[in-house]
């Protein structure tokens, strides 16, 4: 069955158009609420959101949907995606909902669903809910309509949980940390957690107004945090995205440390302590060949999946791995969380920094990345990858890189983009290959 609503990371789109309307949000609430009503207990859903203006509308619409089919609603307000997953489990809820479009601009929004175990739903569950969206579902009797309430201590519960990912004797005293919360969901909790652990915290991206989430700040816009690290002579910078499930680090020299380097650090450190499970790390086809070579040199493997943290997590669960992620900064550490958690990952990096006594620039660049280039080509309709000219360009590029590099071409799961990535030891050849394919896609789009 083809997906109409759910993409690679839930439902996402431009507010008040397509799949992202209040009407559809209410129907998602009704469908998901009906799907998860099992047993005779009073059913409950936990709803969190980021700081987008449309979050109010979507939260209200989903609350109406859930309560109309007899499910009680617990409203968390602005909270990171991993906090929703954690609180879904700890509150014994039947499901969790995060209203967010992650790193996208404020005009977009999205819906992510978590099961009672705190994990994102399976493809099968999402497809079943999709089919229910198109049906007229039975509503609750008047006496069985659900109630909605807000809980006031959600922030404190999450802060306690992320601090518990570190041993009790680990403190961050003496570290000057710049944290950029992207004017998003972590604007309160992450600076608070770092401060409680003893760090000197300089926070930016902590003044959300509904329209400035990810706007020139956060893990996809690093100029702001680099400038602040330089200005304050900070030891390290921690950049999160709008829903705080991804992390990019900036060292004291304002050099970028991406998800591949973070996975290399956490993976090898856990392996040295005998705590790494699965014999390696799980990442996607977009992770740099340098990461694979680094892990192999330490007797570890790199398992690759399709792009999307859900696929990384599926492989981690099936193979018994406890470290996985994406180059873009999704870090999944299943010893501590059931989904990507930028704050938990940041604490592991900071703990390593404290114990090593080294500056971040020495600790966090464990391998030299192979030259890699990623370009996005926007298209307005059709399927450009099926064009004969594009297929021929791809075949020619693969022949040029054979044995010397990798080529990954894929449509975005959330935007009308074709992503073209190549890597290899020859940077000029990598650039030529990417440009060749991008030109072919543009002409076919």
UniProtKB/Swiss-Prot annotation:
Key words of the record: Isomerase, Magnesium, Metal-binding, Phosphoprotein
Phosphoserine, modified sites: 102
Binding site for Mg(2+): 102, 241, 243, 245
Keyword Secreted: no
Catalytic activity: alpha-D-glucosamine 1-phosphate = D-glucosamine 6-phosphate
A single MF term (Gene Ontology): magnesium ion binding
Entry's family note: Belongs to the phosphohexose mutase family.
Top-level lineage group: Bacteria
Coiled-coil regions, chain positions: none
Enzyme class label: isomerase
Free-text description of this protein's post-translational modifications in UniProt: Activated by phosphorylation.
GO process annotations (BP): carbohydrate metabolic process; peptidoglycan biosynthetic process; UDP-N-acetylglucosamine biosynthetic process
UniProt-recorded name of the protein: Phosphoglucosamine mutase
E.C. designation(s): 5.4.2.10
Transmembrane segments: none
Pfam family for this entry, one: PGM_PMM_II
Cofactors required: Mg(2+)
Role summary: Catalyzes the conversion of glucosamine-6-phosphate to glucosamine-1-phosphate.
InterPro entries: A-D-PHexomutase_a/b/a-I, A-D-PHexomutase_a/b/a-I/II/III, A-D-PHexomutase_a/b/a-II, A-D-PHexomutase_a/b/a-III, A-D-PHexomutase_C, A-D-PHexomutase_C_sf, A-D-PHexomutase_CS, Alpha-D-phosphohexomutase_SF
Cofactor note (record): Binds 1 Mg(2+) ion per subunit.
